[in-house]
Amino acid sequence: MKVLLTAINAKYIHSSLAIRYIYKNCQDLSCDIEMLEVSINNHLIDIANQIFDARPDILGISCYIWNIELVKQLLPLVHRLLPNCKIICGGPEVSYATKEFMQDFPMVDFVVRGEGEKAFHDLLQALLDDKNNEEIKIAGIAKRNSDDTIDENIAVTVSDLDEIISLPEEIVEQLK
């Protein structure tokens, strides 16, 4: 299974800590995880082509105030190009009105609400275990069921930060 974690940054010089933390915290899983970083200044078609060229089975997209309008344009396009790809959105722009977002974008299978390192990891593990959407019950994961109903789970916060694998210092230094 191939997973593509995608960040659409505000500027070319920005880097996403979010996808790096997700990547680092999912390293124990038996799947191929790649990261793609682009900026809101990239053309929509170019971003869609980069995602298509990666041929992910699962696409994770970080949604923030600076990229949400581009993400909303990108989702239907990616779904047309990769109709069997599971789409997972996360970030503050999809965490508060999750049900409405998922109703507006029926191609989105899951939304990670709140802190994503553990929730995304657990969701990937469930998908690797071939669980169907109805079987998946993970704190912080909203999901679309086979009958198109949407189950929202409360966003979670991590109370013990030692549960989250930190980025190595060399990666942090590279991002400065």
Located regions from the model:
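Short beta-strand segments enriched in small/hydrophobic residues
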Residues: 2-9
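Short N-terminal binding/cap micro-motifs at the start of the first secondary-structure element
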Residues: 12-18
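Residue-level signal for short, function-critical loop segments
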Residues: 9-11, 65
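Radical SAM [4Fe-4S] cluster-binding motif and immediate context
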Residues: 162-176
